[in-house]
């Protein structure tokens, strides 16, 4: 049975004081725009759901904000190739969701789209995706692997924050920036390869991770405050392109014993595993796990705040 009617979307918990023309078809409520369909509500359901590519002959191209966020018994969802956008909080906080298949036409994934899907096991983002909203997969505690498609150039704020079972991340060489807290508190993430395309690593991007060693490629020019703070690092290699290193980048890395800067770097250098500016007049960071006594070189005229924090 198909019913078209005017409804106050707030009555369905979709938004406040928004009036829209919507259509009910089986388990979905949707709106039509320019001959295509956006699903704005799914009747509460459990188990596996395959979103149709067409409804009544019209392509389903969008999943609206919060469309499935009440389907707490949902275990699996398949998003068809017809869909090009997944809205904010579209699948937010679905504790039983273990599997998501994202269609090959999706270009944007909204803020918090899959956040707190605490049983989700893996994430594969297709090459078609060019935009991932902040915290899109944050606190997906059981996710062990993430594959990011070729279309993504920026990993935004907190996208995989607190994915504490995450052990494997595959980033393409198209990524140029890793944002604020993007992988923060991924405590099982012991190894990561930062692509040669990355130019900036944001504030706290890998803070609280289980990383044991990291090589910062020559393409990177800036590393934000606390980028690797409180991680499990034992060694770090900084490439030739880095010209800006924020405060506390390696703060509370109590296992870190050695920081190495590539000789060709124009702004920074290292000696005896300690990070300095190029002229070695400013001591930037003493690794927190450095053992024994350390004598500050005679030429040092300034020491950065927290340079010896937690040593």
Region spans (language model):
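Bacterial N-terminal signal peptides
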Residues: 9-20
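Structural signature of tandem-repeat unit edges
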Residues: 29-34, 45-61, 72-85, 94-108, ...
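Boundary at the C-terminal end of the N-terminal hydrophobic targeting segment
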Residues: 22-28
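N-terminal cofactor/phosphate-binding cores enriched in small/glycine residues
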Residues: 64
């Amino acid at each position: 049975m198909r019913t078209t009617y005017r409804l106050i979307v707030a009555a369905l918990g979709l938004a406040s004081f928004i009036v829209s023309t919507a259509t009910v078809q089986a388990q979905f409520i949707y709106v039509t725009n320019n001959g295509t369909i956006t699903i704005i509500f799914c009747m509460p359901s459990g188990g596996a759901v395959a979103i149709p590519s067409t409804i009544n002959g019209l392509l389903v191209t969008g999943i609206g904000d919060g469309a499935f966020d009440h389907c707490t018994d949902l275990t699996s969802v398949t998003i068809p190739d017809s869909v090009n956008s997944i809205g904010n909080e579209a699948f937010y906080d679905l504790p039983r969701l273990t599997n998501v298949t994202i269609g090959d036409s999706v270009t944007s994934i909204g803020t918090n789209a899959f956040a707190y899907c605490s049983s989700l096991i893996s994430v594969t983002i297709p090459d078609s995706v060019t935009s991932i909203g902040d915290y899109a997969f944050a606190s997906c505690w059981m996710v062990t692997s993430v594959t990011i498609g070729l279309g993504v150039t920026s990993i935004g704020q907190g996208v995989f924050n607190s994915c504490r079972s995450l052990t494997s991340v595959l980033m393409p060489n198209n990524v140029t920036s890793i944002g604020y807290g993007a992988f923060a508190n991924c405590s099982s993430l012991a190894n990561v390869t930062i692509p040669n395309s990355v130019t900036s690593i944001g504030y706290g991007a890998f803070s609280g991770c289980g990383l044991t060693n990291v090589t910062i490629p020559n393409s990177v020019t800036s590393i934000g405050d606390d980028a690797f703070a409180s991680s499990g690092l034992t060694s770090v290699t900084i490439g030739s392109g880095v010209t800006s290193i924020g405060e506390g980048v390696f703060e509370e890395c109590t296992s870190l014993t050695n920081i190495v800067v590539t000789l060709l770097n124009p702004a920074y250098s290292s000696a005896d595993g300690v990070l300095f500016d190029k002229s070695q007049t400013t001591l930037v960071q003493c690794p927190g796990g450095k053992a024994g006594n350390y004598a500050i070189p005679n030429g040092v005229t300034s020491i950065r705040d927290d340079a010896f924090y937690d040593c």
